[in-house]
Amino acid sequence: MTQAAEADGAVKVVGDDITNNLSLVRDEVADTAAKVDPEQVAVLARQIVQPGRVFVAGAGRSGLVLRMAAMRLMHFGLTVHVAGDTTTPAISAGDLLLVASGSGTTSGVVKSAETAKKAGARIAAFTTNPDSPLAGLADAVVIIPAAQKTDHGSHISRQYAGSLFEQVLFVVTEAVFQSLWDHTEVEAEELWTRHANLE
């Protein structure tokens, strides 16, 4: 225990802990994002704006990040669906499935990719593992060189589980949206008209 632990065993977080860990997260995200191949991301971005609908699928925290990406792509004017939602239609030929799995082996995500492939849809994937089943199914792959969630004690990250992958996934999807938007003359006010008004 450090000074953050009191004599009775209760943990007392102090300001220095937060400062140090903000720096830790910031530096790990910056270092890892800098190692992502921008050409891989550009190929994925071009897949997104091809004709067809966009579907997103991911488990756990990766899935939550892709939900955020789906929201931005909806703001951009694309037709976007989240796999598993009750109103999500069947994927079909010409559509794109955007998936994320740190390991590239998450069973539900791989199964979704296999189903989409059989339907004639395109697959774009984010993963840490270029040799994974998910990467093998994908038409476009972005490798995020972060630790996998089961890689405890990794030299890549001091953070728990798949945190670094999920953080960089968020940053990369935000960069994709920003890059797509940069190539239009659409004002923020127009994007805002698509924002949910039933909140």
Swiss-Prot record:
Cited PROSITE patterns: SIS
**Induction trigger:** By methanol or methylamine.
Catalyzed chemical reaction(s): D-arabino-hex-3-ulose 6-phosphate = beta-D-fructose 6-phosphate
Pathway where this protein functions: One-carbon metabolism; formaldehyde assimilation via RuMP pathway; D-fructose 6-phosphate from D-ribulose 5-phosphate and formaldehyde: step 2/2
Which residue positions does the secretion signal occupy?
none
UniProt-listed GO biological process terms: carbohydrate derivative metabolic process; formaldehyde assimilation via ribulose monophosphate cycle
Q: Which residues form the active site?
A: E166 (proton acceptor)
Keyword field contains Isomerase = yes
- Mind listing the UniProt keywords for this protein, alphabetically? Carbohydrate metabolism, Isomerase
Question: Per its record, how is this protein called by name?
Answer: 3-hexulose-6-phosphate isomerase
